């Protein structure tokens, strides 16, 4: 079933587990992710990122992600990860994505707040949820803080006091934080600031997101979730698992592309299952969001009702 992030992350925050976001730039990845979620009875977040659009255009990806989510027997969020531009975020909402991330973390704090607040209002009017980012998660070129490794890494970490202000001013439904994590496979061992995670989790009332999950140790994940992480982003691990399975299959056959597909799907399924069990989201598909309706929900519902009334009056 297609749901937004509130439906899966609020129960996760309350019950101390995390839901994985797995990016699916093609049908094989999507099939493996859904298969894992259904077999483990895990809620799941599936989507793509703006940086991945050259490998799977947003509109084309929506043609299979959204129908697959609706058909699934478990809650599935279809999410735009790291939307970098206003137009891409709007397009995702128009296509039916149930959640977006508007990443303005490299802007000034004031500009980040302004832009994300504007997009949050729009997303909520669609009944969708939105994730923002505060602090800067690097791209891992040489250290856990990417190309910024020559500077003090902690300078890019999320400030707990600003986190509270950011959430209150923007109305985001989830907050991605920088605590020593980085995108891509780690070249040097990461050092997560678990105390910072705990402090932020106790300061804000929305679920926290850990980007750059691929490459962290199992203990890193467990402790991060224990301290307050409710959503973990994964791509590198399933991407590598798929290509390794295809290469192994290719070496043992003399057939064509379609013979590689089952191997890729199964590899993605198995790697996703490992993560779902590690995050303790397995068996949680039927946990309902029983938290009180938020101000964002009320605002979104009010806008939807107003829009319907306006349509009626203009007939």
What do these predicted regions represent?
Residues 3-15, 25-52, 58-75, 82-204, ...:
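Alpha/beta enzyme core
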Residues 1, 16-19, 80, 175, ...:
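Intrinsic structural disorder
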Residues 19, 102, 258-261:
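Active-site oxyanion-binding pockets that recognize sulfate/phosphate
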Residues 217-315:
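C-terminal alpha-helical cap/extension of soluble enzyme domains
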Residues 210-212:
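Thr-Gly-centered strand-to-loop micro-motif
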């Amino acid at each position: 079933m297609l749901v937004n992030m509130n439906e899966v992350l609020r129960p996760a925050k309350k019950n101390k587990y995390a839901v994985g976001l797995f990016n699916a730039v093609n049908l094989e990845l999507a099939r493996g992710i859904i298969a894992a979620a259904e077999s483990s009875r895990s809620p799941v977040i599936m989507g793509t990122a703006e940086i991945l659009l050259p490998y799977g255009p947003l509109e084309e990806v929506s043609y299979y992600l959204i129908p697959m989510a609706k058909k699934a027997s478990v809650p599935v969020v279809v999410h735009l990860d790291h939307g970098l531009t206003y137009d891409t975020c709007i397009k995702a909402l128009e296509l039916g994505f149930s959640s977006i991330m508007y990443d303005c973390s490299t802007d000034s704090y004031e500009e980040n707040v302004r832009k994300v607040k504007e997009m949050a209002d729009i997303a909520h009017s669609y009944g969708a949820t939105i994730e923002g980012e505060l602090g800067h998660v690097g791209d891992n070129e040489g250290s856990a803080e990417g190309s910024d490794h020559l500077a003090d890494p902690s300078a890019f970490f999320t400030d707990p006091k600003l986190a509270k202000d950011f959430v209150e001013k923007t109305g985001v439904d989830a907050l991605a934080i920088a605590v020593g994590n980085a995108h891509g496979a780690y070249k040097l061992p990461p050092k997560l600031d678990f105390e910072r995670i705990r402090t932020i989790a106790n300061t804000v009332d929305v679920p926290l997101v850990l980007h750059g999950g691929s490459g962290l140790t199992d203990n890193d994940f467990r402790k991060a979730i224990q301290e307050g992480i409710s959503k973990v982003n994964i791509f590198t691990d399933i991407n590598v698992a798929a290509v390794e399975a295809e290469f192994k299959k290719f070496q043992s056959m003399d057939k064509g592309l379609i013979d590689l597909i089952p191997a890729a799907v199964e590899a993605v399924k198995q790697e996703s299952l490992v993560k779902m069990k590690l995050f303790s989201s397995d068996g949680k598909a039927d946990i309902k969001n029983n938290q009180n309706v938020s101000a964002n929900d009320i605002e979104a519902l009010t806008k939807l009702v107003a829009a319907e009334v306006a349509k009626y009056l203009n007939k």
